[in-house]
Amino acid sequence: MAGTKEIRTKIKSVQNTRKITKAMEMVAASKMRKAQERMRNARPYAEKVRNIAAHLASANPEFKHPFMQEREVKRVGMIVVTTDKGLCGGLNTNVLRAVTNELKTLQGRGVDVQATAIGGKGMQFLSRIGAKVVSNVVQLGDTPHLEKLIGAIKVQLDAFTNGEVDAVYLSYTRFINTMKQEPMVEQLLPLAADKLAQTEEEKRAYSWDYIYEPDAQTVVEDLLVRYVEALVYQAVAENMASEQSARMVAMKAASDNAKNVIGELQLDYNKTRQAAITKELSEIVSGAAAV
């Protein structure tokens, strides 16, 4: 059995670790609330752009944007959204497992894949498996800025427009609630027709027409690009909210485990100390009897 000094050292070490995990839990909880707010604020913009684009597309059916053109899929672009940091449970593992499964499916059909990494963990993973990475952005910080993302996103959008890829997929972690996050792999391009289809309610709400400057085609082109960029930004915002939630839960679990370990070590310490005292008393009694 370990001595009391060794056990005290272990207790001190675990206590220090628990202080760190507890602090990280509190920081993650604070960042999670801010990340959720950013995520909620991003949704109305994307939805408003979609509504206007849908209205313009229905008013100008003769115009077909390249983002809506279906082609035989021989080459695919994959945008992989992960975190820059670890200590967030199985968040990155789950989404990268979904990406791996999708890559195996595509490669099994003879489809070439080129990837864009958003987040350091995704970049490390893609480099490790030897994937073709055409663009990346890392170190986004706690607040994602669209201007940091546009350069990496544009590489895939231009590749689709120029016919270099026939589809673009987006993988990220969708935020469900604090305790649940879901890995997603969705088709970003070509845009599904139902995404730009107006409901009856939207048709009534957008029953007017616009005066276009310079012309309807240019406006629709710009709007659809902004819409796709907004979808990627929304995915990054959801991923960040998921990251902070997962980190808070992981650090709470670590703090709870540390508390249990401290309790067990304290019990061992008490037993060891009691055994040492009992031994000393026995030696004193034996010595007194001998005299």
From Swiss-Prot:
Entry's Gene Ontology BP terms: proton motive force-driven plasma membrane ATP synthesis
Gene3D superfamilies referenced in this protein's UniProt entry, alphabetically: 3.40.1380.10, ATP synthase, gamma subunit, helix hairpin domain
Keyword Cell inner membrane: yes
The UniProt record lists the keyword Ion transport: yes
UniProt-listed Pfam families: ATP-synt (PF00231)
Recorded topology in the membrane: Peripheral membrane protein
GO cellular component, one term: proton-transporting ATP synthase complex
GO molecular function: ATP binding; proton-transporting ATP synthase activity, rotational mechanism
Subcellular location: Cell inner membrane
Subunit text: F-type ATPases have 2 components, CF(1) - the catalytic core - and CF(0) - the membrane proton channel. CF(1) has five subunits: alpha(3), beta(3), gamma(1), delta(1), epsilon(1). CF(0) has three main subunits: a, b and c.
Matching HAMAP family: ATP_synth_gamma_bact
Family the entry assigns: Belongs to the ATPase gamma chain family.
Protein name, as recorded: ATP synthase gamma chain
Species this protein is from: Cupriavidus pinatubonensis (strain JMP 134 / LMG 1197) (Cupriavidus necator (strain JMP 134))
Lineage: Bacteria, Pseudomonadati, Pseudomonadota, Betaproteobacteria, Burkholderiales
